[in-house]
């Protein structure tokens, strides 16, 4: 029996991006000596560094930092204000920070506690002998302010992942690594890449508001520090797993297992799920295990590790351009940049290439990585063997894109862009001013049709004409630039007014 859906029965619902990422970190309590606070700030305020990081990535709601130096001050702040995260910086002369964390955890068990410490062999030995049961994460401060952003986003992802994956299918990237120093370095690179990609994909949104909301649908990152934690996270999110990055050697059953990453890869492969897997190791000889798992391999000792990681994620996890390959030679046939480009080129993809990419879920991953969940969900559940031929596959992909674009365009006032306005566009504006009465009325009807789909039926379609509205600020610019207000509001006759208006130049935006 074919698993291909009947598109007439399939109704796409707009993704409620506004309901995603509802739990955020607004206030951070930093417990550190004055010297450690100064070292962290590096002659600049923590708030300013975080604000700059958020701004550079078009993120909103940067948290505020409150700094204290003692446990008593921390408990007093916690009594009087709400904090979503506590960061502790232990000093070698102050051995009570872990005891303080345990005491705080007793009174505030739901607030995550992170230990942030400079890296040294002495610190590593000390942490190995400490009771870390009250600590959620330990990070090594390497002088990079991007680590603070990564810590905040990691905690936010942990808080929001259960609801966001269940409600709309937000994807998960799992990093398995037990080296504090290494994941403290890798996570900032990983987050910066994912956030930059999401920022780029969000440009396909129809207006600034939708662009901001769509970034909430970016893939979330989860960190596992031992085999059991990796299996637990994988089992919980296996249906939403965009990809996995795993070290080769980490803790398994309480002891260091040099083949834990390989064993975890085997566990993943036994599920039969098609999930990209990147195996990392400090020993180049372990690439043979990656090959056996049909995984990519990265040498952790490589000086180009950040670039290698970015390249593998770009290739395997659905980010960047969709490169259509010849399955026999692995040569590039064509490159697809965005949704509209895929719609235009899908009928040009050769049969064998289409089978190759469909059988590996590359199309659904292309949609998932861009937070286009409705078409991704459909394609994910259609097996390549369900298609009677590849023409049927091409038609399904094309029709899904058309239906998705129509759904996204309905009831939305888009910003007019010449290269994007086509037969599937509904309503766009030029300018930032008021739509005016007629334009606002049409926009209202479009919004009602989207909000109440039962208004439409097979026998009675409700829609609005394709519309481009020139906003009032464009009209004002036209009038002021050409000095037409005195003419229009004066005593001149109609023929004179008409002559002045016909001579006038339109604003360059038109």
Q: Where are the predicted features?
A:
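Non-catalytic signal-transmission and effector/linker regions of two-component phosphorelay proteins
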Residues: 1-66, 102, 130-137, 141-220, ...
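As written
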Residues: 97, 127-138, 289-298
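Hydrophobic/aromatic residues positioned on beta-strands within the core alpha/beta folds
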Residues: 116-118, 280, 300
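Structural beta-sheet core signal
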Residues: 30, 113-115, 175, 279
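N-terminal beta-alpha lobe that positions the nucleotide/phosphoryl donor
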Residues: 341-344, 349-510
